[in-house]
Amino acid sequence: MPAPILDIFVDGACKGNPGIGGWGVLMRYGQHEKVLMGAQWHTTNNRMELTAAIEALKAIKRPCPILISTDSVYVKNGITHWLPVWKKNNWRNASKKPIKNIELWQALDQLNQRYEIEWRWVKGHAGNPGNEIADELANRAIESLRQKTS
């Protein structure tokens, strides 16, 4: 009997871009659910999207098949298409400029190599329950950080 799939939904949010940002993760494995979230000052939406994926992968306890759903075309295309080219070009884009968020992409690349992962893009704010929960967590993290400093 094959192992169940670890179903992960990741999302990032930013109030201002750059501005205060948050990330949220919903992880489902069989009947078990885990949520993660965090926030940062002076960040971007893309950084929060990447951070959500990184934190999700860091939280995995043991190898299993993984499906990661993101509403970020940047993350989905980056990890599935652009990353091999960036690495071959010494972490530079087609214009020969260093890629943005290099430290996050390198961290995600290392974690991505540890597991068997299928990356899936989902339309944001379109009623996908897992994506809606991850989005809610990201926004809740932003509000929590705001309240801590008010």
UniProtKB/Swiss-Prot annotation:
Intracellular or extracellular location(s): Cytoplasm
InterPro entries: RNase_H, RNaseH-like_sf, RNaseH_domain, RNaseH_sf, RNaseHI
Annotated cofactor note: Binds 1 Mg(2+) ion per subunit. May bind a second metal ion at a regulatory site, or after substrate binding.
Cofactor(s) it depends on: Mg(2+)
Residues bound to Mg(2+) 2: D11, D135
Listed Pfam families: RNase_H
GO MF annotation list: magnesium ion binding; nucleic acid binding; RNA-DNA hybrid ribonuclease activity
Keyword Nucleotide-binding: no
Keyword list, A-Z: Cytoplasm, Endonuclease, Hydrolase, Magnesium, Metal-binding, Nuclease
Binding sites annotated in the UniProt record for Mg(2+) 1: D11, E49, D71
Catalysis: reaction(s): Endonucleolytic cleavage to 5'-phosphomonoester
EC number(s) from the headed UniProt entry: 3.1.26.4
Primary location: cytoplasm
GO CC, any one term: cytoplasm
Enzyme class at the top of the EC tree: hydrolase
Single biological process term from Gene Ontology: DNA replication, removal of RNA primer
NCBIfam families: PRK00203.1
Function: Endonuclease that specifically degrades the RNA of RNA-DNA hybrids.
Stated family: Belongs to the RNase H family.
Subunit relationships: Monomer.
PANTHER family for the chain: RIBONUCLEASE H1
Protein name per Swiss-Prot or TrEMBL: Ribonuclease H
GN (gene name): rnhA
